[in-house]
């Protein structure tokens, strides 16, 4: 739903250590045969491809809050900067999720709402091999070939950027 511009927030169990804003790539894990029609490139295969990118300009922490003495189960709330909590209804609506769907995904734990801005869907979806992963070593970050999508998220760079840096050395 991100690629269709309907989803304004992505709910995740984790968040990167990066500060906002940062670029996030959209990997389509859809079933075989997913396609999109681009005015420039025509019909393109989407599944198992990076189909676009967005800027994450804000991350909200989702946490469970219940009323003292209530028998009602705690509900998802957004933790505010002054450590207050407000209901997560608007965030869940922007994420195209019901509270039950969010709870099922988060398995009763806390999570994060990644806010989506500057959405860019590629005319031609890109293969993972066009990106380079970054692995943390004792000498700093080191490029590594990406052969499969990360299970949640990973730090990547576009292969073209890495090649340009290497040529400039």
Which sequence ranges carry the predicted segments?
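Structured alpha/beta reader/binder surfaces that contact nucleic acids or chromatin modification marks
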Residues: 1-169
């Amino acid at each position: 739903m991100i690629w269709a511009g309907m989803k304004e927030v992505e709910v995740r169990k984790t968040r990167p250590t990066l500060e906002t804003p940062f670029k996030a790539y959209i990997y389509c894990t859809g079933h075989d045969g997913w396609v999109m029609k681009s005015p420039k490139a025509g019909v393109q295969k989407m599944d198992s491809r990076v189909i676009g990118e967005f800027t994450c300009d804000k991350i909200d922490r989702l946490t469970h809050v219940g009323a003292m003495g209530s028998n009602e189960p705690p509900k998802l709330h957004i933790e505010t900067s002054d450590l207050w909590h407000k209901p997560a209804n608007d965030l869940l609506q922007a994420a195209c999720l019901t509270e039950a769907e969010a709870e099922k995904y988060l398995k009763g734990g806390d999570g994060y709402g990644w806010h989506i801005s500057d959405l860019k869907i590629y005319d031609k979806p890109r293969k993972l091999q066009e990106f380079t992963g970054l692995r943390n070593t004792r000498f700093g970050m080191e490029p590594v070939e990406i052969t499969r999508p990360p299970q949640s998220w990973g730090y990547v760079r576009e292969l073209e950027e890495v090649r340009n840096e290497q040529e400039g050395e």
